[in-house]
């Protein structure tokens, strides 16, 4: 019953035919999306990646062709040879580009059949995701996934073309390298030739791209696969793709302009014109205005409204008047009933209560108690009559979070040094400042409340409604991150970014005396509250790199064991350099409006890092293990 393709060649893709093609003889090939049998007339909706065309088999085609059409089922692979004609006006399908024409079949070849399907790719109600991942080759036939994968291709091409035009070389770096942990665990590859020794799959090409700058290539980029053996979390992939680049002799703004350029090219693939340059905000401003280092600018910033309250009023509310009193505004939500407020409180992080951080959400009650105060709060925060207003402040007794009294070597400030700048409603003082642990709890707690409220009301009040313009996408650069973070458990400093990030020149003298006061020349590009990419100006001097390793508690012996090859390379005329890496998967997910990374990756893993289609990972034979000198000592249940 099945036919060979022979020397038959298709003349058109299924989605290409238009009314102007009427009268042509065509050869179409693809999958049967739907079959409708009306007796003497059989309709086949023929599908390939370009779209769908309707083929009709009439009695004039002959008994053999009619019998073949009767045998065809959904997802059979067929070839149709016939003549195109205009549809009758009352049968035109305006929902598809080919809806004005149909192909009257003279010949039908069945190139392959199809078993009963576990689900249909044309179903409007999706099957369970595990089933779809197991049969990914069927799931990938869905039009939505086809559009996503095509978009991924177009975005990658746009980025490549832009960077090529800017003089960047696309250079491949090794996949099998040495283990130099950068935070997450490495995926290790055992060596058969050298028993007991291992390669590692790269978490990023970090050191190789820096070595390319030492080698004089000036501008490098790569759209590269990376691997991280992270703890299992929703919507994370153990292998992912990033847009990686490095530049010699840059300032941070040099990197910013390059990234803005290729993101503008990427967004143009969906018809969105981004406005550049992106605004900049220091880490300190982000924490003070948004309570997070990945601010979502689609929502109003928080505002410190202490000035609206008399001191005795705050004390009567058991609020500490010496600490920030933060107003959060959620647009267009209006006032809520007591029941609605009670339901909202269930969304707030439990640790707010543990830290004695108060959420004052009954503004009517506050206005009755302090009639002059709420109008001032609204003025300072920009809240309107249709907005929902919440105030977050510190209780007068701090219960802490189990870490009170534990301090880094340089004092009570956590997260290091911050540069303040101007902010909304005069919210951020000028000059240099530190945040105490208590202040940080308040800002971050308020930031969590702000996000919880936004997520709760997003759909109901169309907070994040997409309008198909650049205003849907609020991008910014966050700069001046702390160089180090204090680890309470280990009682030592860790690199906040990675240990190859350069400190600010003005802070070099604090590396040994006050590491918490050192700012990094690090920067993130953030879109609508999501980090798209992270980068920095790198250390190009061996003496400074050694100081950073020392500040991280790394002995000279450990430095040599882990990074000796790189420390050696730094001594051979290394130029100043810097770069960034952005997640391609996440960029495409945002552009596609997808809910999950798995919707824009052709062959993704589950949240448990399993490939259900090929059933990986799997045990290997004892012979393979013996060749590698490996013994399996036990399995951990996931």
Set out the residue ranges of the language-model regions.
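Class II aminoacyl-tRNA synthetase catalytic cores and aaRS-like
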Residues: 1-638
């Amino acid at each position: 019953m099945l036919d060979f393709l022979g020397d038959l060649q298709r003349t058109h893709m299924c989605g290409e035919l238009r009314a102007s093609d009427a009268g042509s003889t065509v050869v179409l090939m693809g999958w049967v999306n739907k079959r409708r049998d009306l007796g003497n007339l059989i309709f086949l909706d023929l599908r390939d990646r370009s779209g769908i065309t309707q083929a009709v088999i009439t009695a004039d085609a002959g008994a053999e062709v009619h019998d073949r059409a009767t045998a065809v089922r959904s997802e059979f692979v067929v070839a149709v040879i016939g003549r195109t004609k205009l549809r009758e006006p009352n049968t035109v399908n305006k929902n598809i580009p080919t809806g004005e024409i149909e192909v009257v079949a003279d010949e039908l070849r069945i190139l392959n059949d199809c078993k009963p399907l576990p689900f249909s790719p044309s179903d409007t109600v999706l099957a369970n995701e595990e089933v779809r991942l197991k049969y990914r080759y069927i799931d990938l036939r869905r039009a939505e996934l086809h559009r996503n994968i095509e978009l991924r291709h177009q975005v990658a091409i746009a980025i490549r073309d832009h960077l090529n035009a800017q003089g960047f070389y696309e250079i491949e770096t090794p996949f099998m390298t040495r283990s130099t942990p950068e935070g997450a665990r490495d995926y290790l590859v055992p060596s058969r030739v050298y028993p007991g020794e291992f390669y590692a799959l790269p978490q990023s090409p970090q050191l190789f791209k820096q070595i390319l700058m030492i080698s004089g290539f000036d501008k490098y980029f790569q759209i590269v696969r990376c691997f991280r053996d992270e703890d299992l979390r929703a919507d994370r992939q153990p292998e992912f793709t990033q847009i990686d680049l490095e530049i010699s002799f840059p300032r941070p703004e040099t990197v910013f302009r390059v990234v803005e350029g290729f993101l503008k090219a990427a967004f143009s693939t969906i018809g969105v014109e981004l406005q550049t340059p992106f605004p900049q905000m220091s880490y300190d401003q982000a924490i003070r205005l948004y309570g997070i280092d990945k601010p979502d600018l689609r929502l109003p910033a928080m505002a410190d409204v202490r000035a609206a309250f008399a001191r005795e009023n705050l004390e009567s509310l058991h609020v500490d008047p010496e600490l920030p009193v933060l107003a959060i505004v959620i647009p267009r939500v209006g006032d809520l009933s007591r029941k609605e407020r009670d339901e909202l409180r269930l969304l707030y992080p439990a640790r707010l209560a543990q830290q004695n951080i108060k959420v004052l959400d009954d503004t009517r009650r506050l206005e009755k108690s302090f009639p002059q105060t709420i109008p001032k709060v609204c003025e300072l925060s920009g809240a309107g009559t249709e907005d929902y207003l919440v105030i977050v402040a510190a209780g007068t007794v701090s219960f802490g979070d189990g870490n009170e009294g534990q301090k880094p070597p340089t004092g009570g400030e956590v997260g290091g040094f911050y540069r303040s700048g101007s902010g909304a409603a005069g919210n951020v003082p000028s000059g240099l400042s530190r945040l105490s642990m208590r202040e940080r709890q308040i800002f971050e707690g308020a930031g969590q409340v702000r996000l919880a409220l936004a997520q709760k009301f997003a759909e109901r009040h169309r907070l994040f409604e997409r309008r198909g313009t650049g205003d849907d996408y609020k991008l910014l650069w966050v700069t001046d991150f702390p160089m180090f973070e204090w680890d309470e458990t280990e009682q030592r400093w860790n690199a906040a970014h990675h240990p190859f990030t350069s400190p600010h020149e003005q802070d070099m003298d604090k590396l040994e005396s006050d590491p918490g006061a050192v700012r990094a020349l690090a920067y993130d590009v953030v879109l609508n509250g999501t980090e798209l990419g992270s980068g920095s100006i790198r250390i190009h001097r061996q003496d400074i790199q050694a100081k950073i390793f020392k500040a991280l508690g790394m002995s000279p012996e450990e430095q040599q064991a882990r990074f000796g090859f790189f420390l050696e390379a730094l001594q051979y005329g290394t130029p100043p350099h810097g770069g960034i890496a952005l997640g391609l998967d996440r960029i495409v997910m945002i552009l596609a409006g997808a809910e999950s990374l798995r919707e824009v990756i052709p062959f993704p893993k589950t949240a448990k890092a399993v490939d259900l289609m090929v059933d990986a990972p799997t045990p290997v034979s004892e012979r393979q293990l013996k060749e590698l000198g490996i013994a399996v000592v036990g399995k951990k249940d996931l």
